[in-house]
UniProtKB/Swiss-Prot annotation:
Disulfide bonds: none annotated. GO terms for molecular function: rRNA binding; structural constituent of ribosome; tRNA binding. The gene is rplE. Keywords: Ribonucleoprotein, Ribosomal protein, RNA-binding, rRNA-binding, tRNA-binding. This is Large ribosomal subunit protein uL5. One of its GO terms (cellular component) is ribosome. One of its GO terms (biological process) is translation. Part of the 50S ribosomal subunit; part of the 5S rRNA/L5/L18/L25 subcomplex. Contacts the 5S rRNA and the P site tRNA. Forms a bridge to the 30S subunit in the 70S ribosome. Belongs to the universal ribosomal protein uL5 family. This is one of the proteins that bind and probably mediate the attachment of the 5S RNA into the large ribosomal subunit, where it forms part of the central protuberance. In the 70S ribosome it contacts protein S13 of the 30S subunit (bridge B1b), connecting the 2 subunits; this bridge is implicated in subunit movement. Contacts the P site tRNA; the 5S rRNA and some of its associated proteins might help stabilize positioning of ribosome-bound tRNAs. It comes from the Bacteria. HAMAP family: Ribosomal_uL5_B. The keyword Disulfide bond does not apply.
Amino acid sequence: MLGSLSKDAVAKSLVSRLGKKNVMQVPRVVKVCLNMGIGISAADSKVMDSCTRDLAMISAQKPVVTRARKSIAGFKIRKGFPIGCMVTLRGKRMYEFLDRLINIALPRERDFRGLSTSQLDGHGNISFGIKEHISFLEVDYDKIDKVRGLDVVIVTTATNDADAKALLLELGFPFMN
């Protein structure tokens, strides 16, 4: 499993690669946030239920419904209107999700060439989108009403992009050259 690998082998190899003095200074993954925006079709409760069901199957955790903070007439939404769902993964579930993401979902993604270094935010975190949530094996293609995308944010304790990229490369994330 990726969690035990992260704490032992990855940390020891990062100590020498990053020039740190001990294992506690090495960056680690803190949490993974998954967000699925639904858009204007959120008025239909069936769409909302299917999105929360799909995200729950992907993350193995019940998602929270996100609601609009203020009304925007141009988008035809009112305050409190459901606009998506999100889930935050930590600990064992986070490492299980990262393992499935790296080894199953990203290779199945259509036209995926690797993550870009421009997706790092300058503070050691990375955000990217997955175009089709059916890349995950947990989602049954016959039971979905529409193929949707989702956003993935990986938060690390790294203070810069170089340390974060080194951590993600050790975990097995594919980066473009």
